[in-house]
Amino acid sequence: MTDHEPFQREPQNPQDPQVVVFSPELLKLADRRRQALEDCRQAAEDGDANAVVQMGMNCLYGIGGAAKDPEKAFRWFSQTAPDDPAGLYWLGVCYDNGFGVERDEDRACRLYQESAAGDYAPALCNLGVCYESGQGVEKNLEKAVELYRRAAEGGYPMGRCNLGVMYFFGQGVEKDLKKAAYCFAQAAEQRLPRAQYLLGVCCEFGDGVERDVSRALALYREAADAGYPDAQCALGVLHHQGKGVDQDDREA
């Protein structure tokens, strides 16, 4: 439902029958990571709000030398202070997606509201999604647009992208393809795959920008390389049709 997208790479299969030779440099790097994780854990246990959130993220995604453990991540996020917007947001993400706790969309929405009160851009964006879909609150597209705009003004790429979608379809705001394309372009510059794809659509069909199939192809390729399925499909269609590129069914 939310804009939350995991960004970690899945670790290799530990049962993979291969011989791994660690160089002294890699061993030193591993030691530094372990020490950094221990320092972060100690700071979190001492009450450092940023460290608490970082430990939660480490455990949620299996990054920073921590093992992936959603339940432990939830416990860390639960220790955040009631006035910490980042911690409240991540706790909301856990409830929203069922990470380490039973899914509770209403609770997630309330946490996003508390976090958004501190103008935390990711929470503003997710709260906008709640109002757009009617999750935990009465559906209100105008309110969703307002929240997406505030998130966009805070420089949050998904806020910019979602605002662009509202302009593109005229939901909660007057339809304006030029403003939609502008929002997509802002988010695409921040390398958001969804925005790269949507800007590519605008370029392919001339929606809000001058039609430019070559640019659309480049945008689709960037988003596809990042694993965005719709972009991979669009890229395949262009190769199949030979639009902006030599026709190539094998590449499609």
Regions found by a protein language model. Name each.
Residues 26-34, 67-71, 104-105, 140-141, ...:
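Helix-turn-helix repeat elements of alpha-solenoid scaffolds
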Residues 6-61:
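N-terminal segments that cap or nucleate solenoid repeat domains
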Residues 54-61, 66, 88-97, 101, ...:
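Hydrophobic face of amphipathic alpha-helices that form TPR/SEL1-like repeat modules
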Residues 45-49, 61-63, 82-85, 97-99, ...:
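Short helix-capping/linker turns of helical repeat alpha-solenoids
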